[in-house]
Structure formats: structure tokens, C-alpha cells
Amino acid sequence: MAAPPSTRLQGMLQTAVQSVQWTYSLFWQLCPQQGILVWGDGYYNGAIKTRKTVLPIEVSAEEASLQRSQQLRELYDSLSAGESNQQTRRPCAALSPEDLTESEWFYLMCVSFSFPPGVGLPGKAYAKRQHVWLTGANEVDSKVFSRAILAKSARVQTVVCIPLLDGVVELGNTERVQEDIGFIHQVKSFFIDHHPPPPPKPALSEHSTSNLATSSVHPRFHSPPLPLTYAPLDPPLIANQIHMEEEQEQEQEEDEDDDDDDDDEEEAESDSEAHTGLNSEAQNPRVDHVARAAAEPSELMQLEMSEDIRLGSPDDGSNNMDPDFQLMVASQGGNPADQQQRVDSFRAESTRRWPLLQDPLGRSLQAPTSGGTGLEELTQDDTHYSQTVSTILQHQSNRWLESSSSSAAGCLMYSSQSSFSKWPLRPSDHHHQADATSQCLLKYILFTVPFLHSKYRDDNNSPKSATAADSASRFRKPTPQDELSANHVLAERRRREKLNERFIILRSLVPFVTKMDKASILGDTIEYVKQLRKNIQDLEARARQIEIDQRSRSSGDPQRSGAKAATDKRKLRIVEASGGAKGKAVDSVAVATPPPPAPPQPVAGVGVQVQVSIIESDALVELQCTHREGLLLDVMVVLRDHRVEVTAVQSSLTNGVFVAELRAKVKENVNGKKPSIVEVKRAIHQIIP
């Protein structure tokens, strides 16, 4: 079943993720050219940090989430632009990296991931055709979940991958959810209900002009059309007959040499007979098939297209069989020289047009370098590859029904949109496992060729002499512009965090704040500093007045001052007569001991003061009230119930007055909302005596 168009797919993803109230939903689709699962579409349903786009009308939450998903994709395209657009790529996006939450970063970075079948959660779900449920995605190792580091920062705890629509639907949640089969059926129902109608099943013959309609009008992958080549549905019957005659002649020659050969030659003969038997088993089904086709009077070839088979085109992404079919009939008549010439040309064309392939197990295959090879060169990997292709074709509900006359063999034109390559059955045309150099050469080409093309486009000149190793290393290294941009983003983030910490500290020093924004905090701080300066001036003036009053009192009481002077003189005489240590003792006796300070009395009628400030995710709570047992614990429990997690506490108790300062982190709920200052204050006042 082909993937639906983009708008319908996004609508299904939106309906599914909103119905289960999860954070995001993604669709991984199979890229026909690369054979891997890549990003198809997605919908973000999580928390939104800020909205920079000002809309003329009020929009609903669904429309806002849909616009947010589109803005995140535009931001990724903007950030992944080429070096030529380095200076102008940021303004084209409605968002900037500083405006995203951690969960939005996780959703954004998922666009850059791809998974071969069998690798990662989407790859395993696609290969096994079973759902994969991962709980605790932020706690597992990167080998289990490749995006574990991103999930840890975004607090994504549950990830589910469900194979649907010839791809994989992935849903993620920031909460821990246990596996539920009812959840899987519920998600599948949204996609099964939108099942597209099956394509028509036309009947094709030699003179038929019926075409198969492509199932998708919106191509997802674009690639240049393949050159028009021809692949035989079966190898030429003449070549099979000639090969069988050659084998019979070899068997007769071996039988004649049996009398004179020694034991070693007999063992070689047995090996040859074993290979010959294998070849006959491979050829006999094809001969019987041709014989049955010759006996049937029908000349109609039926092609039934199924939604399960994936034979399609690289250009339209629908992977349906090419609509343009032409039946070419090669006559078997003629002299033996023409027949032999056609066989040789078939061999040459098969060898020339076989591309460098890679089997499903990841091993590279390449064409033989020269003429026919013996059957003993058929390796186990080649046999496994042919059996795998045969099994896939046999398990499909669609089969080719071919009929032709006894004097003709049918050959099917290979379309430029078909994803099948030519597959001859002759042992001489089987392909051998490539050595390590071919795989290394393929990797070298993949790494170096894109870099060379980009270099020509930027420099507009021919390349100079440079080694291949230097080219590959330069390609793998990030450009200075990318490193500078990444460093700038990190530095800007650190600066913002440090600035927020400074504002939190400044807010804790100011006893009153009108608003919680940074400008209001600065304005209130300025007013508070002015008040402090005024208080200092008042205190200094009061101190001067007290000093003047003391001087006036001392001058108005001369007798007391004279007695004090006489006492000082007596002390001085005692010190001079008795010496240092004794004088000090007498002096200490002479000095009157001041009375001890009175114990502090408890303050009566202490007023309750509660100050709460919240800046982004940081919160500060200041509390002053009458003390009671367990008050601090009750305050922390109330804050936790309002999703305010306390990180630091400073408290003191003086004369029955309890003073506390609590620093905390504010968490968001499922809808991305944070508790307000009024709610926190009201909850604290309810528990204060």
C-alpha cells in the first residue's frame, strides 16, 4: 500500500496523537533509492515555549500545534541550508533555536535521522512487521535507542513504533506509559480507516494498450530517470539448450576417460556430476514452464497488482509496477549461426549492464569481469540471494501468467521507472561476492564525490592536484562557519542562563516587585537603591544630631565632668606607682563592669509576608510568619503539588519568628502550562497559621 499524500498523512498523524494525548507523532517511510527509512512527516503536540508569530485572528490549540510543526520543519530546513546561504538562512524561519523547548529540539532533530531496516526502533518494527514499545527511553543506552541522549534532555520516556502504510508510525510521550495492546489497535484504526482504494487490475497482452495508474500523485523522492534497458523475463531458450548440449558432451567425454583415470580423476568426476545435477535442477523448472506455456492456447498475460508488493518506481515513490509494458517476441527460427550470435550478444549485454549491487544482508556484489564462468564459482551468498528473491516473489499474491507459442519466447521491456534489475539464470551470469576493495571503493566514492561537486560549484574552477585521502578528510570535517554558528548558539544559551540567574538573585534582594519581567525588576531595583540612599542620609543626619546633643549635655554638667577628671588622675597615679601588671589589675578593678544585656523578648503580632517570583522555569519563595512545628515541610509539600520542585532552602527561627527562602524549578503540565504566582501564594496562605 502506497503512502498517502502529505496533507492526508499529516492529518492522520494529528488525529492519532491528539486522541491519545501524546507529545509527538512521526512517520518513517522507505526511500526506494537508498533502501532506508527516512523522515516522511510528523506532528508536534507537546509544550511550546514561545510564539513569535503574531496572527491577525485568534487560533485554536490544534491550529497552533499544526503551525508549530510546520515552523519546526522550516527551521530545520533553514539550519541545514548550504554554505552559500549561511548568512541568510536564519531569517527565513519563523523560529530560532533559542525559542525551542527541549521536547521541540528532540522533534526537530528526528528529521535528520534515518534507519536501515532492522536497525533502531523504526527499523526493527519495519523488518519484523510488529510494533516495538520502549519504556524509559531516557534511561536506556544509546545502543538500544540511538536518540537516548536527546530523549534524556527532552524527558521523553515512552516511544512506540508501529509498522503502517509501508512505513513506521512513531509516537512519543514525556510520561512513562506501560505497554497496552489496546493503544496499538486504537492508533492503527486511524490509519486503517484512511485505507486508499486498490489500483485497477488491467489485462495486458501483446497488443494491449492498458496502463496502470500510479497510486501516488505526490512524489516524495526525486531522482534522475534510469536509462532504458531491457531485461529478459526468462533467459533465451536457445542459450539453455546449447548449454545443456555442452554439458551432455562433457559427460560423454568424462565417461570415456573413466577406464584410464586414477582415483583422483574419479573424485573429480563425481564433483563434476554433482555440479551438473545442481545445474539440471536449476534448469528443469524453466524448461517445464516453457513447455507448458507452448501447450497452452491462450495468448493473454494477466498482471494483478497487490497493495503488498513493492515493485515500484524511484520517481513517484509509489513503488507500483511501471504502466508502460511492451511485449517483445523473439523468433526462434533461423539458422544456428544467428541463434549462437543472439546467445553471445545476450551474454555480453548481461555482463555489461549488471550494476554494482548490494544484497539484503549488506554484502556487495559485482558482475564477472570476463566470459562464462564454471558452476563451481557460484558462492553460497549468490545462492542465498537468488533464493531470497524467489521466496519474495512466490509469497506475493500477484504472479505472472505467461503464454506464448512453441516457436517464440517472450521478453519484457525493462522500464525506466522499474526498480528491478536484470536477473539471468545461467550459471555463467551469476555474480560473485566482491572482495574488500570493492566495498572500500564504494565507501570512498560516497564520501568524496559530493565534496568534489560542491567544491567545483563554490570555486568555479577546475580542481588542482590533491590526494584522495585529503579530499575525504576535508569532506568529513565540519566547515568553520558551522562550528562558529554552533559555538555562537552555545555561548548565547550560556549567557541567557547566567543572566537569568543574576535576575533571580537581584529579585531576592529587592523586597517588593511590581511585575516579574526583567524590565520591571530593574526599575524596582533602582527605586529600592534610591530608598536605601535616602535612609542612609537620614541615619547620618540623626547620628550627627545625637552627637551634638551629647556634647551639649556634657558641657552643661561641669561637676560631673570634674569628678570624672579627678578619677582619671587617680588611676594614672596608681599605674605609675605600682608598675605594668599590677597597674593593669587595679585599672581593671577601677573600671565599672557594664550590666549584661537583657534577653530578647518575643515579637508580638508578627505579620505574615509571602513573596513569590517566577522567571521562566526558576522560582523564588520568601516567607516570614509565626513559627509552628512542621511548617517548612508543609510548605514544600504544597509547592510540590503545584509542580514547583524545591532545589535549595534557607530558613531561620528567631524569637518565634520563622523566616525561610526557597529556590525551586517550575515544571509544566501536559498542556505546557505553568502554575501562576497567584496560585502559589494562595496555596501557601492556606497553611500558614
Swiss-Prot record:
Keywords assigned: Activator, DNA-binding, Nucleus, Transcription, Transcription regulation
Record note on quaternary structure: Interacts with MYB123.
GO cellular component: nucleus
Segments of this protein annotated with the region Basic motif: 483-496
Biased composition (Polar residues): 206-217
Positions of the bHLH domain: 483-532
Designated name of the protein: Transcription factor BHLH42
One Gene Ontology term from the biological process aspect of the record: positive regulation of DNA-templated transcription
Protein location: Nucleus
Alphabetized GO MF terms: DNA binding; protein dimerization activity
Protein source organism: Actinidia chinensis var. chinensis (Chinese soft-hair kiwi)
Pfam families hit by this protein: bHLH-MYC_N, bHLH-TF_ACT-like_plant, HLH
SMART domains: HLH
